[in-house]
């Protein structure tokens, strides 16, 4: 009997190796449970890498694809793109006297990001050409830094080009895992805690200011301030419940929708105006980057813009690796055995993110790209591979960009701020705390947080990495195992490059009066 069972299993494995997906596919009715059917689908898929993958022949659409595509992916990315563009608008308006960008600009740029990049990099790239590359989405940990990036004199296009080039080099030389090993858990934890805490405080302040500032002909200013407290209080309870029941991947849509409903129910509806017209946004790159009077109002990037963008591009790429590896590990934890062929390829994903970063921004966008976590995590939980949901998601995102009016709701403070709180900043804060497991980690984390407050997170990360890798703080046993290049050359080089770039463009002038060299 045992021999018969092993023969059957060996034959199944042999069939999976030799037969095509179409030959191996069996209808769901032949399986005892839906979960077994989905497991079998993952085990028999053979995605073609940079070849044409077709529905029916190489993969199928299932109801479960709607979970990552509709619930988490689409709603999540509308909130994130809107938040990124609002951060750019606020930061650039503050940084430059001639620039005045507002909500209309943010919505228009978000719609640009939701059209061609969604078509090229969701539908075509991850759907049809390489289903092993996860979708290129939004780099959550960089959102709290966008204001600082703008104030530092950086240029979105310069940042995108540097980020794209560094990302391509990293994926070509397979350097992602090297960067992960260079930054200790204490240093990474401190960085995430600082970004999570400062971001959380800024979102809470924004909701409070919005609620207190509500006024109309019938409503006195300050009389509706309690709405902010109710929105925040209810969302904290919901977030805690979702965490308890392992449904945190639903946090963005549930909490954003809750914020919308509460604000409307308590009478703040007069503040929500649907002004965005149906149609296409301006898709001419010359409009966005061609002059200082329209679009981004920055013109083409200069050498100074590239130098100002350099430290942030280095940090963004360094933060890619743990993000990408985390998404792949999450897939491995949720998928059955023998599904290696459908797991996301970290280097392919990095290549796609790098190209998408440059293409999306060149077309007029301002997103900072990374592996799309709000897509991958629910997809892994739903036991679905990348392509089916990617195609549905890309089509949904493009539809909303053309409709226009959902974007007005997405940038309304009780919606956008709640989405950022539960989708970016609280998870960053929690992830940072989980990384600090002992006194050695807390030393590095403390120095990183202190350095971030004194100067900025980029310089603090580089300095803490140098101190930590040389055993001056943190785990001395870990430091003893590192080579001279890992201890001194790479961390020291990153620190010197970042410091020179910051001093050259006067990034520390407003804080410490250090004049720009250029």
List each model region and its residues:
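Membrane-embedded helical hairpins/re-entrant loop segments and their flanking transmembrane helices
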Residues: 19, 23-24, 43-67, 83-125, ...
């Amino acid at each position: 009997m045992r021999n018969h069972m092993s023969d059957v299993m060996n034959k199944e494995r042999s069939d999976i190796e030799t037969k095509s997906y179409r030959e191996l596919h069996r209808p769901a009715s032949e399986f005892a449970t839906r979960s077994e059917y989905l497991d079998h689908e993952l085990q028999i898929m053979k995605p073609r890498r940079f070849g044409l993958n077709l529905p029916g022949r190489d993969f199928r659409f299932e109801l479960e694809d709607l979970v990552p595509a509709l619930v988490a992916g689409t709603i999540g990315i509308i909130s994130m793109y809107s938040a990124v563009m609002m951060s750019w608008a606020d930061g650039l308006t503050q940084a430059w006297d001639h620039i005045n960008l507002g909500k209309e600009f943010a919505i228009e740029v978000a719609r640009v990001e939701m059209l061609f990049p969604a078509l090229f990099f969701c539908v075509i790239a991850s759907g049809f050409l390489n289903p092993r590359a996860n979708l290129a989405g939004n780099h959550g940990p960089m959102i709290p830094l966008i204001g600082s990036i703008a104030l530092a004199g950086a240029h979105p296009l310069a940042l995108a080009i540097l980020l794209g080039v560094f990302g391509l080099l990293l994926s070509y030389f397979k350097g992602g895992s090297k960067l992960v090993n260079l930054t200790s858990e204490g240093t990474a934890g401190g960085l995430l805690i600082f970004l999570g805490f400062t971001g959380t405080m800024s979102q809470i302040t924004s909701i409070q200011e919005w609620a207190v500032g509500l006024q109309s002909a019938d409503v006195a200013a300050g009389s509706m301030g309690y709405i902010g407290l109710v929105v925040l209080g209810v969302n904290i309870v919901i977030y805690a419940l979702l965490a308890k029941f392992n449904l945190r991947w639903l946090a963005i849509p549930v909490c954003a929708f809750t914020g919308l409903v509460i604000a409307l129910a308590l009478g703040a509806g007069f503040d929500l105006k649907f002004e965005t017209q149906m149609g296409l946004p301006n898709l001419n790159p010359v409009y966005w980057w061609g002059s200082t009077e329209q679009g981004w109002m920055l013109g083409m990037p200069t050498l100074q813009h590239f130098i100002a963008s350099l430290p942030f591009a280095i940090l963004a790429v360094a933060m890619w690796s743990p993000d990408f590896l985390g998404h792949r590990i999450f897939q491995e934890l949720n998928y059955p055995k023998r599904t290696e062929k459908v797991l996301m390829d970290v280097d392919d994903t990095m290549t796609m993110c790098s190209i998408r970063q440059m293409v999306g921004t060149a077309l007029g966008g301002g997103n900072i790209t990374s592996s799309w976590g709000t897509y991958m995590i629910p997809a892994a939980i739903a036991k679905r591979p990348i392509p089916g949901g990617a195609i549905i998601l890309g089509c949904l995102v493009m539809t909303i960009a053309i409709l226009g009016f959902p974007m007005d709701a997405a940038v309304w403070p009780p919606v956008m701020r709640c989405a950022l709180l539960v989708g970016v900043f609280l998870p960053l804060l929690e992830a940072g705390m989980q990384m600090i497991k002992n006194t050695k980690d807390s030393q590095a984390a403390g120095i990183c947080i202190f350095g971030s407050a004194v100067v900025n997170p980029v310089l603090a990360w580089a300095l803490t990495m140098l101190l930590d890798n040389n055993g001056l703080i943190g785990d001395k046993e870990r430091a003893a195992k590192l080579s001279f290049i890992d201890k001194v050359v790479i961390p020291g080089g990153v620190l010197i490059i970042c410091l020179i770039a910051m001093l050259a463009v006067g990034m520390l002038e407003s804080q410490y009066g250090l004049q720009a060299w250029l």
